[in-house]
A protein has these predicted regions:
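Bacterial N-terminal signal peptides
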Residues: 7-17
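N-terminal alpha-helical interaction blocks
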Residues: 26-122
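Sequence context surrounding c-type heme c attachment/ligation sites in exported
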Residues: 24, 111, 117-303
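Sec/Tat signal peptide C-region and signal peptidase I cleavage site
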Residues: 19-23
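Positively charged n-region of N-terminal signal peptides that target proteins for export
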Residues: 1-4
Length: 303
């Protein structure tokens, strides 16, 4: 991370100040993720999830399958992801959307470099892992009992996790989504949030525990909301626990904590920013080498 910050600052600041003649939205990486300097699809990987898969296939680590949660607890333990980070969201914003609802919310767990998504009854565990050079990689683990489950790359996730909202690099994002009415013709309404978003615009279709009643937000409401951007929102239920809202079997903890939500939203934008800085610098150094110029860090020192 420190290397990215040192090498990437000049390149990123220049890119942020530039508007392209093609009319592309600014502030995003514009090269291919498989640019020779990046090689996102086939470059070497050194992330925690890839290391775990190698250990599992070598028989050095055993992942234990449980009837309700599958490999969830075992994977969290192996990757040192705390169960206290659990967040629950019932918007259908996953490729396992057909299984997600207020009575069966998707659970998300995270640490500094890994995020794990679990849907009770789902076919796979969803895993995102921050590689020191490649950025955020996406994986899935089949929720079927076997001696050595494989952790496979899953670029299907890039349909949502590679966009302008992730700064043009494979990255992380959180949505605030208004609960859907019971109408098959209704359209989902939502927007990306991070640490810069007003609290009153955050957490639509998320359960939020531990928030004081004075904090206005869009969480804890499963009924359709008449929402006007910028307008004051009605108070939502203040929850101390998830108990009584839905069947908690399989969930390691009965919480979806406010503090964990705040940390995750800060992490998403910061992760994407650091990845983009790294990619911008590598492309700049690659092009400089082809042209016989010094790399970006040396050029900055010369100036």
């Amino acid at each position: 991370m420190k290397v990215w910050l040192c090498l990437g600052a000049v390149v990123l600041l220049a890119a942020l100040a530039t508007t392209t003649v093609t009319g592309q939205r600014g502030g995003a990486f514009r090269e291919s993720r498989d640019h020779p300097a990046i090689r996102y699809s086939d470059g070497p990987r050194h992330d925690a999830v890839t290391a775990l898969d190698r250990a599992v296939q070598a028989g050095e680590v055993a992942l234990v399958f449980e009837p309700t949660s599958g490999y969830l607890r075992s994977v969290l333990e192996a990757l040192d992801v705390p169960v206290e980070s659990q967040l629950t969201v019932f918007s259908e914003t996953s490729f396992q959307a057909h299984r997600i609802n207020p009575e069966n919310p998707r659970a998300i767990y995270f640490n500094d470099t890994v995020a794990v998504g679990w849907v009770r009854g789902g076919d796979v565990l969803e895993v995102a892992s921050l590689d020191p050079t490649q950025g955020v990689l996406f994986f899935s683990i089949d929720q079927q009992p076997t001696d050595r489950p494989q952790i496979r790359r899953n670029d299907q996730c890039l349909a949502c996790h590679l966009s302008w909202d992730t700064l043009g690099v494979p990255g992380l994002l959180t949505f605030s989504t208004l609960p859907m009415p019971d109408d098959p013709n209704a359209y989902a309404v939502g927007w990306v949030t991070d640490h810069r978003s007003p609290l009153q615009e955050r957490w639509g279709s998320w359960y939020v525990t531990g928030a004081p009643p004075s904090v206005r937000h869009l969480g804890n409401t499963t009924e359709p909301i008449e929402y006007v951007p910028g307008a004051s929102t009605d108070p939502t239920p203040a929850l101390d626990t998830l108990e009584g809202l839905f069947d908690l079997r399989g969930y390691p903890t009965p919480y979806s904590d406010l503090v964990a939500l705040l940390v995750l939203e800060h992490r998403t934008h910061m992760t994407n920013l650091l990845v983009r800085m790294g990619w911008e610098t590598r492309v700049a150094d690659y092009e400089a080498a082809r042209a016989g110029r010094p790399p970006a860090d040396q050029a900055a020192a010369i100036r």
